[in-house]
Amino acid sequence: MAAQCCCRQAPGAEAAPVRPPPEPPPALDVASASSAQLFRLRHLQLGLELRPEARELAGCLVLELCALRPAPRALVLDAHPALRLHSAAFRRAPAAAAETPCAFAFSAPGPGPAPPPPLPAFPEAPGSEPACCPLAFRVDPFTDYGSSLTVTLPPELQAHQPFQVILRYTSTDAPAIWWLDPELTYGCAKPFVFTQGHSVCNRSFFPCFDTPAVKCTYSAVVKAPSGVQVLMSATRSAYMEEEGVFHFHMEHPVPAYLVALVAGDLKPADIGPRSRVWAEPCLLPTATSKLSGAVEQWLSAAERLYGPYMWGRYDIVFLPPSFPIVAMENPCLTFIISSILESDEFLVIDVIHEVAHSWFGNAVTNATWEEMWLSEGLATYAQRRITTETYGAAFTCLETAFRLDALHRQMKLLGEDSPVSKLQVKLEPGVNPSHLMNLFTYEKGYCFVYYLSQLCGDPQRFDDFLRAYVEKYKFTSVVAQDLLDSFLSFFPELKEQSVDCRAGLEFERWLNATGPPLAEPDLSQGSSLTRPVEALFQLWTAEPLDQAAASASAIDISKWRTFQTALFLDRLLDGSPLPQEVVMSLSKCYSSLLDSMNAEIRIRWLQIVVRNDYYPDLHRVRRFLESQMSRMYTIPLYEDLCTGALKSFALEVFYQTQGRLHPNLRRAIQQILSQGLGSSTEPASEPSTELGKAEADTDSDAQALLLGDEAPSSAISLRDVNVSA
């Protein structure tokens, strides 16, 4: 049997010992229908067959469990209407402490109906092999993002007695599984599929305890069409050529949402001693040149701050533009959208943020979705410590100022009393946790962590605390009180000073008060980069305009950092609508220059164009939307177009480009375009030729097209997908 090994264990590194999950039951999670509090999940095994022609995944799941109390009547798992369960079975665990993972038998392809899901093949044990017996099961509604799967258990089960539950299923139209036809990839050569589990989508990938409070190790065997490369978030992987299947194993406990898979026309290139990039062949040279050597630099900086990297390898896979978020911190294998490759500084920040998640989020995880700031706030703090170590304080302060500007912009939109501005957000039953993802999770969380670092008076001492915190809680899930108790225990002098009760800055108020952060970091070390931005913005808002424009045009922003230009454009966006003569002068001064910059800059300028109904530059908006297939670069423009007087223009561009968009993104844009149909779409001023034939279309015709065959499917709800960057 020929085996091509792709081991993710770092060369010469010893595997960190795996701590068993804590004995107390996991935290209660209202987003989960499961009975996770009654069981301990030890390991899960997946046998998966990818069927891109049918957009179907056929699976066999083997759960290794033990009950925490005697005679549990049933096992309840999170599932989804997209899952069709074929069978459930029970198997007593063998007497041996550790059993070789089971194999899976895959049906041979052929004409006729779709073959059944894979069958498990358990290893023969000495004596009589534990027999499988069928189990009754039922599926009940839970929320609009999932179902509950109840599996009846044998009555004689004892507490702490290991057993296995085997579930065979197929999954179609699953929110977690994104199927792409070849034409939606860069190379247009082979089909592509990826999964996105955060927050609660993986219940449509496989039945599970879909809560961050539960972690376990996993293994998987995956069969894919010939020539398709499969990758998973696993510490070890290998391809068995004779069998035509991929084998994966994750040796550290992870929550269900971090089990991830991607398959397509992917090729690897090493970029460091423990890192490689995977991408479509046409993207691989660019990805390699931008990240070669850099990832190892970031990992080494993180290790100096927070202790050894415990996941073996750190690989990155670049996904097609359909990927619904910017990046996802799947352990050992970060998923990142390929569109970000042209924006160097954003690429650096996004990858470093995912590196930071290796300690904060993946190793130590928030036990409930109500406290996502525990992962995102700490990861953002760690990200900025890493950038300070590698690129200096000025760059870090510039990036922080850019993000805090965005936070205050969101605060104005939501209002200071918005409950989602709390760090500890109360998740009501039925509400999708993905709705809680916002800038407060990241930036208000960061500000609180930064405040804690200032209390101890020395960033290095705070780094030492975080290092000890990770060592204590690695491979477990925690609540905010665990972090704060550990902080006060590590700094007893601060506990004696009752820093948690300082008037106006109480820890409880940080966690539960609405509104902006109670304190923000000192960003004066970045003034050399932020001061020119503020000066240029002030020039463009000064009078008389001709003198201001002349002074502004003397400033060469082509030499600025990307975050400086983005911050300047964001300030202009905040002031929109601007006087038409200002927009005209801005266009004359910057439009051609900005058109040659990366997409993060171009989209901001084009939003200014749209929000100010500046028709002379609409051709640039059209060209941008014709070239983009990414949610991050299309949704904001369509939302702005449909808010103002340019809805007809938006309809026309969408009709011409929809064939190149992923169905999920197409549905999202259709929902934006269909809102308010029936009201006038006539522009506020005389339309240019850019508005074309769409100006003559009737609202009823538009609505018929938007809500006809391409109407949103009940099987895929947009709110099922986390679209936060």
Swiss-Prot record:
It catalyses: Release of N-terminal amino acids, preferentially methionine, from peptides and arylamides. The keyword Transmembrane does not apply. Inhibited by calcium but not affected by chloride ions. Inhibited by amastatin and to a lower extent by bestatin. Weakly inhibited by puromycin. Its cofactor is Zn(2+). GO terms for biological process: proteolysis. Broad specificity aminopeptidase which preferentially hydrolyzes an N-terminal methionine, citrulline or glutamine. This is Aminopeptidase RNPEPL1. It comes from Homo sapiens. The lineage of its organism: Eukaryota, Metazoa, Chordata, Craniata, Vertebrata.
